[in-house]
Amino acid sequence: MTIAETLLPEFDLEMTTTRRVLERVPTDKGKWKPHPKSFSMGHLAQLVAGMPGWITNAVQETYLDLARYPGYSYEKTEDLLESFDRNVAGARKALAASKDSDYAVQWSLKHGERVIFSQPRGAVVRQTINHLVHHRGQLTVYLRLVDVPVPSIYGPTADEPMPGF
């Protein structure tokens, strides 16, 4: 079994769940924040929608430069979903095409010339999935605070039973 074959089932499950969360994001709450120091809901949703693209970058490139990363805007939910679907398809394709040796290649997160960290691609892919799941969890709290039903994720929520049960 290849590394990609071990990653893809988890990736598929997490992306399916993430899409269900993004579907619930109300477009009219883009500027809403639970606290002045928090991201706005629109910023957080756009971050979550874009993060699968970071996996594509990690598998196909050797660095990501945050200084070149576009800023955040407030997108309609439909646009976020289109972006998310495009990023998921690209990441899945990159993962499926990868060789085990690709995961040992060093990858760096940079801001201009400053290197924030460098790690093997395999660690970066896993950390990116974990990072996305973390922000997805934040987004579910935002949804709850604006009275939007929270979908089932790893089990039932107060709003939705677990699918298939």
Label every PLM stretch briefly.
Residues 3-8, 76-81, 125, 129:
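Active-site rim elements
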Residues 2, 39, 72-75, 98, ...:
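Short coil/turn linker and secondary-structure boundary residues
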Residues 8-23, 27-70, 110-165:
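Short, contiguous alpha-helical
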Residues 57-100:
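Helix-adjacent hinge/juxtasegments
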Residues 1-3, 67-68:
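Short, contiguous pre-domain boundary segments
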Residues 97-112:
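Acidic catalytic patch
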